[in-house]
């Protein structure tokens, strides 16, 4: 219908936003200690380096626009015995890049690690490029690894005179096993008098259960919870000098972790994730939609032939209001997550309204869980 305008007014007793999906998570009955905690001090270390990628098919940096690429190229050639100071360099096959990687815990000299290569200048594509020898430094400024190799690019770019297609990110690549570790980080595990376990999700109950499981297994009080994220293990005399064997037995013990009631909401993607212990107190929920339709049908009045009249347009509008019939539902005290979801679905509420309704129930003080909005 010409000239029709739609105005949609949504009245939601609790609230209404959008949600694209609703996910329900439930933790398994038990988990291994190695899945719940890390050994304190045992972690990866970030490495970074600056280098050059060569062999690009004209898709590298524009040397006149990116001075650091030109300076790096000149310095590299001078180390090779080629002096080009003052000469005009015209090449599009070189790109300045940053190289990053994670040094694994207990990595030894000669082992390899993956690295990621990212363009630093205005290079369009790193496809087909080769990273030249690049030292990788730690936060202390020492060189821990050296990277070199051919890049693997997941994205691509193709262009013509009047069109261009880009898929993925062609200016970021990866070299599998592209760096050789040259320096080790010393960590005397077998000399430690005690070991601390760092829980991935801090919780008083879980920390206490881990300590109890270890003490029950060994038959002596060896483990002690320090805080909700730390459990300290004293090395028994029979495992002195052999901490690896001690941890091998401990990390396989099964523990029932306790989870805090939490609802995680990602408003960008519309995803809702709820824990198993989410409970709701007594609350009434209603949701209704009001649709107002405004139709414009202008009428044209034409004068008689050979008359001195004028063509006149007379506006004509019609307004109609439609309200969806929705019920008021009472959610009783102590209902479970499944009952809450079933109740909301019974109201005819789709996933698009779930996020705001949950936020409104929380604002009313009727939901026993933390809501984290990402």
UniProtKB/Swiss-Prot annotation:
Database matches in InterPro entries: Flag_FlgI
Main location: periplasm
Assembly and interaction partners: The basal body constitutes a major portion of the flagellar organelle and consists of four rings (L,P,S, and M) mounted on a central rod.
Protein's recorded name: Flagellar P-ring protein 1
Species per Swiss-Prot/TrEMBL record: Bradyrhizobium diazoefficiens (strain JCM 10833 / BCRC 13528 / IAM 13628 / NBRC 14792 / USDA 110)
Superkingdom to which the source organism belongs: Bacteria
Family: Belongs to the FlgI family.
GO molecular function: structural molecule activity
Keyword field: Bacterial flagellum, Periplasm, Signal
Signal peptide coordinates: 1-29
Function: Assembles around the rod to form the L-ring and probably protects the motor/basal body from shearing forces during rotation.
GO biological process, one term: bacterial-type flagellum-dependent cell motility
Gene Ontology CC terms, in alphabetical order: bacterial-type flagellum basal body, distal rod, P ring; outer membrane-bounded periplasmic space
Compartment(s) of residence: Periplasm; Bacterial flagellum basal body
Statement: the UniProt record of this protein carries the keyword Transport: no
